[in-house]
Amino acid sequence: MICPRCKNQDSQYFYTFKNITYCRKCVKIGSTCFSPSRSPSIIKTVDYQLDYELTPLQNNISRQLLQRYQQHLNTSLKAVCGAGKTEITYEVIKYALNQGQRVCFTTPRKELVIELAKRLQSQFKNISITTVYGGHSELVDGQFIICTTHQLYRYPQYFDLLILDELDAFPYVNNEVLIGLLQNSIKGNYIYMSATLTNQPDLLMTKRYHGYLLDVPKCYLTSALVMYLWAIKKIRDFVRKKKPVLVYVPTIQLTNTVARIFKLFKLKSHAISSNTKDIQKFIERFRHHQLDVLVTTTILERGITIDNVQVIILYGNNRIYTTATLIQICGRVGRKTAHPSGSISIFTPYKTRAIKECLKTIKQDNA
């Protein structure tokens, strides 16, 4: 027996009650009572508008994505943080929508979905984008859907084009149920994208859109006490220069502790984690310089772009900081043309293998 949703074949997860068989591996994701419309979509004249021109490299990759989709090929794309990988999917999205096909842009985390939906809805014309995530699922039908990977259970064999951004992000990575739900939602072809793919990609972008190199982090080998004193000194220097600071810590409990410590030194700080309600509100306050510092877990390792932001990583030896996580965190810096570089500081008692691999990878991408 194979579960039609998550593709589970392990018999211990199947349970039959009143002649109905359930898969306990994916039943907690949600019921299957909703059936999206299967009627053919009306062909539209969908277009998009950017306030900037794509670089020659972006245009080249964009054309290749479109050509591969027209040839019914799946594609994996590795693009360094800040390469502008979202924008290079617009041509293939436009093509699919104008063919009357159904398109999904999916990513593992709700915060990324909210950011993406706001951005794409302002750039795409003549199409209403349906946004679906936990707590926001009143409307789930549509031709162009942006959703978390958890919500794909609603769409069996539904999408002609599915774009998965950050496929190596928690909670999707190594999650057999979510992987199965995603595969089951595709009836056409997919594009998988990330800055930290481990397998050889079909397409590769090693340069940021503005042409500047990736910032290489500096490691400070120090004890916890000295770490805090050094970090506070750095943050004060940044604040004087009106530079916002993202401080990463490995646990939720530490976000609150560190934010309180910073407040003792008259720094306007706030803690962000998966427990935080209305994360976007605090990100906007941070973006508009109403906060000096956001102390965050790895929930903000991806998908956040703040102009002129500086990054500090505390307790860099913690196991939560994998090579991929560190590369993504470092990629928060220098994403805007006005401020294409910045400071990344890792405070740790010693260099872990992940830190060494992060440094090696960034230097190789810059070569």
Question: Model segments located where?
Answer:
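Conserved helicase ATPase core of P-loop NTP-dependent helicases/translocases
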Residues: 114, 118, 127-140, 270-297
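A short beta-strand element within the Helicase C-terminal
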Residues: 159-165, 301-317, 343-346
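Conserved segment of the helicase C-terminal RecA-like domain
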Residues: 187-199, 207, 330-361
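SF2 helicase catalytic motif II
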Residues: 149-192
